[in-house]
A protein has these predicted regions:
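Sec-dependent signal peptide cleavage junction
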Residues: 22-44
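A short alpha-helix capping/helix-coil boundary motif
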Residues: 47-51, 73-75, 93-96, 125-127, ...
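Short amphipathic alpha-helical segments at helix-loop
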Residues: 51-55, 80, 139
Length: 188
């Protein structure tokens, strides 16, 4: 096996970044932390996900990395990979933007609505659905890997990512330089 200097440098840089993320998250104060909000999921007796001509969004590189990490985790756990869904991504981006713009961090908006209300308003009905939220302050500690790690370490978020029956995912990330908010939404 031929090892190049570039590969060694990339490996060392990656290790240093991961150690920094881990040490910062372990020693983080409330002003410097990756926080996840208790996952929500719901099961309803309705038709499967129905998506026609609804608002759609495309994953950016960061969001794509989050989705890929979740899929790798699911498949390494013996579950099916889940497909990117443009309307769910639109909804996830709306959620992250609302959390950022209005400065709250909850599965409930200040008006008491949830992502499930947003799904219904955008024509998505499903039997199985869920949401994971995460935020990082300062924004620099909020890598896709850090969010996956935080969700894996939270029993409710981990169960939500590994829920049998999910077929679709949407991911939305907003970064204002000081704070990153990531929303993942899942449906069958």
């Amino acid at each position: 096996m031929k090892v190049s200097l570039k590969n060694i440098v990339v490996f060392i840089a990656t290790a240093v970044v991961m150690l920094l993320v881990i040490s910062m998250s372990l020693a983080a104060s409330p002003a410097s932390a990756i926080e996840v909000k208790g996952s929500t999921s719901s099961t309803q007796e309705q038709a499967g996900a129905q998506v026609d001509s609804k608002p759609q969004a495309v994953l950016n590189d960061y969001e794509n990395a989050v989705a890929a990490l979740i899929n790798n985790y699911r498949t390494s756990s013996g579950l099916n990979a889940i497909a990117y869904e443009p309307t769910l991504t639109y909804i996830a981006k709306l959620r992250s933007a609302d959390l950022m713009d209005r400065g709250y961090f909850s599965h409930y908006t200040p008006e008491g609505t949830t992502v499930f209300d947003l799904m219904k308003a955008n024509g998505i009905t499903s039997k199985i659905r869920g949401e994971n939220l995460g935020q990082a302050m300062p924004a620099g500690i909020g890598s896709p890997e850090a969010f996956l790690g935080a969700w894996r370490n939270s029993p409710s978020h981990n169960a939500n990512m590994l829920r049998v029956g999910y077929n679709y995912i949407g991911v939305g990330m907003v970064d204002n330089g000081d704070r990153i908010v990531v929303t993942t939404v899942f449906t069958n």
